[in-house]
UniProtKB/Swiss-Prot annotation:
Protein name listed in UniProt: 1-acylglycerol-3-phosphate O-acyltransferase PNPLA3
Induction summary: By changes in energy balance: down-regulated following very low-calorie diet, whereas refeeding elevates the mRNA level.
Positions in the Lumenal compartment: 63-481
One Gene Ontology term from the biological process aspect of the record: triglyceride acyl-chain remodeling
Enzyme Commission no: 2.3.1.51, 3.1.1.4, 3.1.1.3
One term under GO cellular component: cytoplasm
Subcellular localization: Membrane; Lipid droplet
Any Pfam family: Patatin
Function: Specifically catalyzes coenzyme A (CoA)-dependent acylation of 1-acyl-sn-glycerol 3-phosphate (2-lysophosphatidic acid/LPA) to generate phosphatidic acid (PA), an important metabolic intermediate and precursor for both triglycerides and glycerophospholipids. Does not esterify other lysophospholipids. Acyl donors are long chain (at least C16) fatty acyl-CoAs: arachidonoyl-CoA, linoleoyl-CoA, oleoyl-CoA and at a lesser extent palmitoyl-CoA.
Length: 481
């Protein structure tokens, strides 16, 4: 919600490969209401939303942002089985792209102005990170915020020695004050800037603060957030973000400068914004000719967008940003050259699928070897962490099974022998990676052994070096025992 008197913040939802939507929405705000971005108290984001916030605060140009996102999509779609190919490593690509694109002083530019949503592995609680001491910490926080368990890998990355996963697991639309935060999401739901659905269905579901309207459109968007569609579809989503943001500005009445729409001539425009093909366009040009000038890769993009928007939003198509349309047009082009065109021929594609049972094992072996080589420096810590998590799981399972087995015992046996010998109870005391608890006494009862073990693993005080290692929330121990 926008509140000019109390100030405002912006929150960008986690949306995977649909981050193009945030680019379009932010471009509209920067053109029609630049004060919303310039004077915002903080920018919040989870996963792809956090990446976008860092890009905005770092001043990364629009063209470079679209290029990075497009390269990620091309990388994910370059194989026959897409993201499921063993060679696709999302975290590795993100880390390399961030180290390349972010400026050296990015930690100074964003500290105190951003809130990156992280999910702590130890207790599943949400953590908002705002202050950074170096560029490496910014990269680590972003990689943690984008790490989807089992999708990005098995071992979560760490930030300042603590393991974190995707912030969307605990809070996908982070904010501090809901009344003064403008929320942005590419999903149909209850947000300030989001698509509007052509339906009378008002059923919603909330998942980690992600409000989703129950409709087929959201099912499609959720699937495309993990499995990227064609770049033309993502270009349409980017333009959709621009239109939804403009509708929000119109509803709030906070547009404060003329629209740089497609009907405008190139006179008085920035040289990098003006397109050569629009130089001969006059102010009297019809909406059809204006739309024709910015159709990307033919007529598919805008025509498909016109079919998917609401009737009263068609007039907003004339306000689309020329610079955004130009940048999208460049990224939609096939950059593979003749070799890419040859590989996209139908006979070649059929042959590649036929040969997949032969080529996939070889490619998988190569990808596994490469991952093992890059994993060698972190292997000792990660193996110890896996052992620690395994012991946690074993302890929880044991604790859940013990009450059931005790309840099945005869009443007479329970009254006759309140303390059963240790060897009659399958209890195992796991050890942490960097230290073991004190040796238990042989004459201790099973309940005391179990309580001691659980207090060690589930207590408020975690051993040094084991922060962020538990994968389950803690609970009251006395009630269970």
């Amino acid at each position: 919600m926008y509140d000019a008197e109390r100030g405002w913040s912006l929150s960008f939802a986690g949306c995977g490969f649909l981050g193009f939507y945030h680019v379009g929405a932010t471009r509209c705000l920067s053109e029609h209401a630049p004060h919303l971005l310039r004077d915002a108290r903080m920018l919040f984001g989870a996963s792809a939303g956090a990446l976008h916030c860092v890009g905005v605060l770092s001043g990364i140009p629009l063209e470079q942002t679209l290029q990075v996102l497009s390269d990620l999509v091309r990388k994910a779609r370059s194989r026959n089985i897409g993201i499921f190919h063993p060679s696709f490593n999302l975290s590795k690509f993100l880390r390399q792209g961030l180290c390349k694109c972010l400026p050296a002083n990015v930690h100074q530019l964003i500290s105190g102005k951003i809130g990156i949503s992280l999910t702590r592995v130890s207790d599943g609680e949400n953590v908002l990170v705002s202050d950074f001491r170096s560029k490496d910490e910014v990269v680590d926080a972003l990689v943690c915020s984008c790490f989807i368990p089992f999708y990005s890998g098995l071992i979560p990355p760490s930030f300042r020695g603590v393991r974190y996963v995707d912030g969307g697991v605990s809070d996908n639309v982070p904010f501090i004050d809901a009344k003064t935060t403008i929320t942005v999401s590419p999903f149909y739901g209850e947000y300030d800037i989001c698509p509007k659905v052509k339906s009378t269905n008002f059923l919603h579901v909330d998942i980690t603060k992600l409000s989703l309207r129950l409709c087929t459109g959201n099912l499609y968007l959720l699937s495309r957030a993990f499995v990227p569609p064609d770049l033309k579809v993502l270009g349409e989503i980017c333009l959709r973000g621009y239109l939804d943001a403009f509708r929000f500005l119109e509803e709030k009445g906070i547009c404060n400068r003329p629209q740089p729409g497609l009907k405008s001539s190139s006179e008085g425009m920035d040289p990098e914004v003006a397109m050569p093909s629009w130089a001969n366009m006059s102010l009297d040009s019809s909406p059809e000719s204006a739309a024709l000038a910015v159709r990307l890769e033919g007529d598919e993009l805008l025509d498909h967008l016109r079919l998917s928007i609401l009737p009263w939003d068609e007039s907003i198509l004339d306000t689309l940003s020329p610079r955004l349309a130009t940048a999208l047009s460049e990224e939609m082009k096939d950059k593979g050259g003749y070799m890419s065109k040859i590989c996209n021929l139908l006979p070649i594609r059929i042959m590649s699928y036929v040969m997949l049972p032969c080529t996939l094992p070889v490619e998988s072996a190569i990808a596994i070897v490469q991952r093992l080589v890059t994993w060698l420096p972190d292997m000792p810590d990660d193996v110890l962490w896996l052992q620690w998590v395994t012991s946690q799981v074993f302890t929880r399972v044991l604790m859940c099974l013990l009450p059931a087995s005790r309840s099945q015992m005869p009443v007479s046996s329970q009254q006759a022998s309140p303390c059963t010998p240790e060897q009659d109870w399958p209890c195992w005391t796991p050890c942490s990676p960097k230290g073991c608890p004190a040796e238990t006494k042989a004459e201790a009862t099973p309940r005391s052994i179990l309580r001691s073990s659980l207090n060690f693993f589930l207590g408020n005080k975690v051993p040094a070096g084991a922060e962020g290692l538990s994968t389950f929330p803690s609970f009251s121990l006395e009630k269970s025992l």
